[in-house]
């Protein structure tokens, strides 16, 4: 079987609430860390989410 080219990552809120999203990314086409603006329901605003490792 072929090895999957996608890694599981955790996108953690920069607002300091501890809220996070999980997703996958193709490690070959995007080797740099992801940074996306998404909605944080704990502060009820759109904030930046940065990539961290899943423990």
Swiss-Prot record:
GO biological process, one term: translation
Residues in coiled coil: none
Compositional bias of kind Polar residues: 14-24
Gene Ontology annotations for the cellular component aspect, listed alphabetically: cytosolic large ribosomal subunit
The UniProt record lists the keyword Ribosomal protein: yes
InterPro entries: Ribosomal_bL33, Ribosomal_bL33_CS, Ribosomal_bL33_sf, Ribosomal_zn-bd
Region listing for Disordered, in residue ranges: 1-27
Gene Ontology terms, MF aspect: structural constituent of ribosome
Biased composition (Basic and acidic residues): 1-11
Keywords of this entry: Ribonucleoprotein, Ribosomal protein
Family: Belongs to the bacterial ribosomal protein bL33 family.
NCBIfam families reported in the protein's UniProt record: PRK00595.1 (NF001860), rpmG_bact (TIGR01023)
HAMAP family: Ribosomal_bL33 (MF_00294)
PANTHER family membership: 54S RIBOSOMAL PROTEIN L39, MITOCHONDRIAL (PTHR15238), LARGE RIBOSOMAL SUBUNIT PROTEIN BL33M (PTHR15238:SF1)
Name assigned to this protein: Large ribosomal subunit protein bL33
Organism: Herminiimonas arsenicoxydans
């Amino acid at each position: 079987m072929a090895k999957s080219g996608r890694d599981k990552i955790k996108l953690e809120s920069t607002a300091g609430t501890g809220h996070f999203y999980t997703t996958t990314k193709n490690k070959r086409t995007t080797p740099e860390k992801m940074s996306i603006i998404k909605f944080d329901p704990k502060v009820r605003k759109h904030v930046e989410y940065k990539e961290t490792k899943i423990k």
